[in-house]
Amino acid sequence: MPRICIVPRTEGVGGMASFRLKLEAGLARRGMEVTHDLAEKSDALLVIGGTREVRGLWRAKRRGTRIVHRLDGINWAHRARRTSPRLWLRSESANLLLAFIRRRLADRVVYQSNFVRDWWMRRYGPVRAPGTVIYNGVDLGIYTPSGDEIPPADSVRVMVVEGSLADGQEAGLPWAVGFAEALAQRMASPLELLIAARVTAGQQAHWGKFSSVPVTFLGVTPREEIPALDRSAHIYFSAEVNPPCPNSVIEALACGLPVAGFAMGALPELVTPEAGCIVPYGGDPWKLDRPDLSSLASAATAVLAELPRYRAGARARAESAFGVEHMLEEYLQVLLD
């Protein structure tokens, strides 16, 4: 019975924790063991992002254990805007740790998207470890259009789901509000914006006062509640800047929720024309320029005019590329073959 070591043992509601839980559940269904102890003997070792247990990785490598490094994006927003010295140092240190594991310890590298792979190649150059792209996956039986929840008939509901829109990740929050405001001007029905993410109290108060559309802040939402939220909305707005491979977008697609966003990060890879609308950014996202919200709102209006077709397209896209079983098979090939 193969044993896979997975480090670090991330917890919470973020993408890394969600991925770990899905992977471990899939391995268990196949009768495989999972450990988080680097000292235990294992057939393969998966590093999700970074870990400070570098000595343990060295020991595992000397034992002949295959090390697979799963990479997300590179910390960059701290360079694009004024931030605290503590956040700047933390971001740079994390980048150096990831680059070290990728170059010195990994036997295989998994990039979450073509965008992520190309980004790492540009910033830190090629490495000896073979690399492959594996998109994130979701349980298509849980994230599904089937359910009791339906969008309101007398209003338009825009959905945003992120782990955090704070601590250096808040740039997408005014974009979400601006998109909702621009879309509301094109709608005959009232519009509301729902944001399921960590948002500071100050930001909540600000947008509650100055937004021209109603904004409901739901806070960090348990992952088991996300499918119902997605099913209850008309359209999803992708608020992350240069998203590497956003789980929330894939979850929305699986629930039949069309996605609206800008052509940055991995979004053009994930959201095909039949699954939503992706438009040119209209500036430089790496400099956090203000995007072309008007063009996106116009494109979203066309999606809402043919919502049943786009709902079906979103679900079809998820079924074709983002099933968790397909993701698991690809990881097993990298880990064990």
Where are these regions (language model features)?
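Conserved donor-binding/catalytic core segment of Leloir-type glycosyltransferases
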Residues: 149-181, 194
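A charged, aromatic-enriched C-terminal amphipathic alpha-helix characteristic of glycosyltransferases
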Residues: 291-295, 305-335
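Short alpha-helical donor nucleotide-sugar binding micro-motif in glycosyltransferases
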Residues: 228-233
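Nucleotide-activated donor-binding/catalytic signature segment of Leloir-type glycosyltransferases, i.e.
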Residues: 204-227
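A short, glycine- and acidic-residue-rich donor-binding loop in the catalytic cores
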Residues: 246-254, 259, 266-270
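A short, active-site helix/loop in glycosyltransferases that binds the activated sugar's phosphate group
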Residues: 101-130, 138, 142, 205
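Aromatic "clamp/platform" in nucleotide-sugar-dependent glycosyltransferases that forms part
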Residues: 241
